[in-house]
Amino acid sequence: MIEQIYTYFTIEILYMWINLGVLPFWFILIVFPQSHLSRIFVTSIFPLFILSGVYIFILYKSYLIGYDFDSNFTLYLGLSELSRLFEDHLYIMIFWTHFIAINLFIGGWIVKDSQKFSINKVLMAVPLIVTYLIGPIGLLLYWIIRIFYAKRISLYE
């Protein structure tokens, strides 16, 4: 049975499941940000444990096929090295899982932080959707909205 699970979860299947798997979390964040569902499943550590498990599985799978992990450190040497790394599907999955996990973490943080300032949940839908698609711009958009509700700029919160 373990062999069947291992052979089922190809890189393409993992990619599909990661993309589909985070959609319920984002739906809860956007539509029900103040619900118990959001507190238990999304703004907690729960989704990050799931994505960490996927990350570890991809690393394990990479190790079994003899992936050269040392080449990952060459990405800091220049754009040509980075583009060479992106030719490998396993590296893309490692990167994509990392990207999805960080964006979901930022989305959860935005929801928790917006509740401290009682920001309208309809207004919060915009930066959350943008964070899902392009994380840093969604975070910037949230900070702009947050300034108006907090009535101050604080770089340390």
Question: Can you say where each PLM-predicted feature lies in the sequence?
Answer:
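Hydrophobic alpha-helical transmembrane segments of multi-pass membrane proteins
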Residues: 14, 94-101, 129
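Transmembrane alpha-helix/helix-exit interface in multi-pass inner-membrane proteins
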Residues: 52-72
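Membrane-interface helix-boundary motifs at transmembrane edges
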Residues: 32-45, 115-119
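Hydrophobic transmembrane alpha-helical segments in integral membrane proteins
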Residues: 2-23
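Hydrophobic, aromatic-rich membrane-embedded alpha-helical segments
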Residues: 124-148
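Membrane-interface interhelical connector segments
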Residues: 67-85
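Short aromatic-rich membrane-water interface segments that cap or initiate transmembrane helices
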Residues: 6-11, 79-94
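N-terminal signal-anchor/start-transfer transmembrane helix
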Residues: 17-37
